[in-house]
Amino acid sequence: MTTEPGLTLYADAFWISPYVFTCFVALREKGLPFAIEEVALQDGAQHKTEFRERSITGRVPALRHGDFWLAESTAIVEYLEEAFPRSPRVLPTDVKARARARQMLSWIRSDLGALRDERSTTTMFYDRSVRPLTHAGEAAAEKLARVVKTLLPEHGGPLFGAWSIADSDLAFMLHRLILNEYELDPKVRAWADSQWWRPSVQEFVTRSRPTYSAY
């Protein structure tokens, strides 16, 4: 009888990476047991030979499954879906809904750069931002809110029929604004808040974090 090799998630030591968030929530929602290893990015631990060579890109999050290593959050989510098909899904089952969810996961990683810069995740878990959004930041905030509102069903529930990791990722992005007192459309705000209180999300959000050191 063989034993399934264990999973280990490699996370940043401050737990502020939105991409670590994605993987952490996905693992919790799939009900998969996993160990956690923190990588001290502020000390350059990601550049150490062992981690860099095994993860290939030297980035967090990274996932180890037995002797297999993988980095990049969307790749990790896809791997978990395929490697553990009997566990609860974190992407929609319908092919078109799944494609749309993947579109959103890709979009928030490749667009909205001004918002990510001006409302970094440090402002969610450490000191809030005191600077108003620039024109570019405001445009990105408005675009994010518009996209979510376009996707929202009338009842305000999950975006693609049943909850998916795209719901949590979009809500996390919206909370860069919410936690810094940005006024959103009430429907969008209510939806983001409902997603924020999901137990797997709250487990990440309420983790104890060390004093922040910039890197």
Kindly give the residue locations of the regions a language model identified.
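A generic structural-conservation signal
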Residues: 36, 60, 186, 204-205
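GST-like fold's C-terminal all-alpha helical module
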Residues: 4, 108-199
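GST-like domain detector, emphasizing the conserved glutathione-binding G-site
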Residues: 1-135
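Phosphate-coordinating loops and pocket residues in cytosolic domains that bind phosphorylated ligands
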Residues: 53, 197, 206
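Conserved beta-strand edge residues that scaffold enzyme active sites
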Residues: 41-42, 191, 209
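Terminal-tail/helix-coil boundary detector
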Residues: 204-215
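Active-site-flanking alpha-helical
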Residues: 81, 173-174, 205
